[in-house]
Amino acid sequence: MKVLWVAVVVALLAGCQADMEGELGPEEPLTTQQPRGKDSQPWEQALGRFWDYLRWVQTLSDQVQEELLNTQVIQELTALMEETMKEVKAYKEELEGQLGPMAQETQARVSKELQAAQARLGSDMEDLRNRLAQYRSEVQAMLGQSTEELRARMASHLRKLRKRLLRDADDLKKRLAVYQAGASEGAERSLSAVRERFGPLVEQGQSRAATLSTLAGQPLLERAEAWRQKLHGRLEEVGVRAQDRLDKIRQQLEEVHAKVEEQGNQMRLQAEAFQARLRSWFEPLVEDMQRQWAGLVEKVQLALRPSPTSPPSENH
C-alpha cells in the first residue's frame, strides 16, 4: 500500500505541477535541486533512480502522516483557553467583592461588562479550536480519497488551508486587541463611577464637619476631619487596587495575544514547510524522468532514421 500511495503522489504531482507553481506565493521557499552533470545517464539508470526515490519516500511516509495527525497545537490552545477564562473569572469575582458593599449599581454594570467580554473571548477561542480540529479532519479525509479526487483537490486544498490559517490568526489578533481596549475602558468607567458616587459624600462630610465645628467646637471638627481623611484613604485604596488588577489583566491579555500569535506563526510555518517538502521530494524525480524520456525518444528517432546509401566504387 505504501508503494502504491507513493506512486499515486508522483503521478499527481506530475499532472498538477503547473497549478501548484501558480498557487504558491513567492514567499514560500523551495529546496534547491542538486546540480547534475551535462552527460546524460542511460535510461536504465534513470529507472533505477526512480525506484530509489520510491523506497526513500516510503521510509518517510509514516513520519509525514504523523505530522499531519498531530494534535499538540489543539491541546496547547485548549489549555491556554481554560487558563485565560479562569483568570478572567477570578478577576471578576474579586472586583465584585471589592465594590459590592459600596456601590451596587457600579457592581452590576462592571459585572455585566465583564460577563460580555468573557463570553466573547470564550466563544472566539472555542471557534479557533474547532477550526483547527476541522482542518485536521479535512486532511485525514483528503488522504483517504480516491486517486481522481485527490488529484483534483490537492493544489487548491493546500492553498485554501494556508489562507484560512493566516486569516484566523489575524482575526483572533484583532479581536484580542478589541477586548484589551474594552477591558481598559470598562475599568476606567468603573473608577469614574466610584469617584462620582463618593465625591458628594466627601463634600457632605466636609460641610457637616464645618457646621458641627461652629456648634461643638474644635474636638468635633478634628473627629470629622479624621473621618473625612479615613474615607478618602479608603476611596484611594479601592482605586489603587482596581488599577493594579487592570494592569494585571492587561498583562495577561498581552501574554495570551503573544502566545496565540506564536501558535499562528508556527502553524503557518508548518504548512509552508510541508508544501516545500512535498515539492522537494518529487520535483527532482519528475524533471529527471522527463529529461530521460526526452533523451530516450531522441535516441530512438536517431536509431530509426535511414542512413544515406553510399555510391558504388568503380574499379579501373
Swiss-Prot record:
Region entry Specificity for association with VLDL, spans: 277-289
Signal peptide positions (record): 1-18
Sequence repeats: 79-100, 101-122, 123-144, 145-166, 167-188, 189-210, 211-232, 233-254
Location of Methionine sulfoxide modifications: 142
Residues that coordinate or bind heparin: 161-164, 228-235
Gene Ontology BP, a term: regulation of innate immune response
UniProt KW keywords: Chylomicron, Endosome, Extracellular matrix, Glycoprotein, HDL, Heparin-binding, Lipid transport, Lipid-binding, Oxidation, Phosphoprotein, Repeat, Secreted, Signal, Transport, VLDL
Region described as Homooligomerization: 265-316
UniProt GO molecular function: amyloid-beta binding; antioxidant activity; cholesterol transfer activity; enzyme binding; heparan sulfate proteoglycan binding; heparin binding; identical protein binding; lipoprotein particle binding
Family stated for the protein in its record: Belongs to the apolipoprotein A1/A4/E family.
Subunit note: Homotetramer. May interact with ABCA1; functionally associated with ABCA1 in the biogenesis of HDLs. May interact with APP/A4 amyloid-beta peptide; the interaction is extremely stable in vitro but its physiological significance is unclear. May interact with MAPT. May interact with MAP2. In the cerebrospinal fluid, interacts with secreted SORL1. Interacts with PMEL; this allows the loading of PMEL luminal fragment on ILVs to induce fibril nucleation.
Task performed by this protein: APOE is an apolipoprotein, a protein associating with lipid particles, that mainly functions in lipoprotein-mediated lipid transport between organs via the plasma and interstitial fluids. APOE is a core component of plasma lipoproteins and is involved in their production, conversion and clearance. Apolipoproteins are amphipathic molecules that interact both with lipids of the lipoprotein particle core and the aqueous environment of the plasma.
UniProt protein name: Apolipoprotein E
